[in-house]
């Protein structure tokens, strides 16, 4: 497996370690000239005041669900959670709401492979994830997906 995963496994059950999963970031200023306001117009009174300038951030963490090996030596099962938000922080006239927050829980299995090209570690992962904005009716969006990958 990649060196990162090997090092993460060494600290996985330390009570003071939070492991990042996907990229964590804060973009204090983002701009879009194509904000699709129609769904908001149907439910929110403030839709006409949405700003083209907003902040965006993503927080993503994971936790192991097993301490010992499951099927083979060095494998792990994880739960991951990613939140991605678009915040109308510069829209003073509508009290700076969060325009959208997407929630993405996932469960995935990671295992090492007995293949060491150029002396490196390799592995594979397989998982399932769901993404939803947590809204209902016209503003609702969600999807499910299964995935697999090779770790080099």
Pin down the residues of each PLM region:
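Outer-membrane beta-barrel initiation region
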Residues: 1-105
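Residues on the lipid-exposed face of transmembrane beta-strands in outer-membrane beta-barrel proteins
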Residues: 59-65, 105-111, 128, 148-152
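Outer-membrane beta-barrel pore domains and translocons
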Residues: 82-86, 110, 127-133
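"Short basic amphipathic alpha-helical interaction patches in structured regions
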Residues: 93-100, 121-123, 140-144
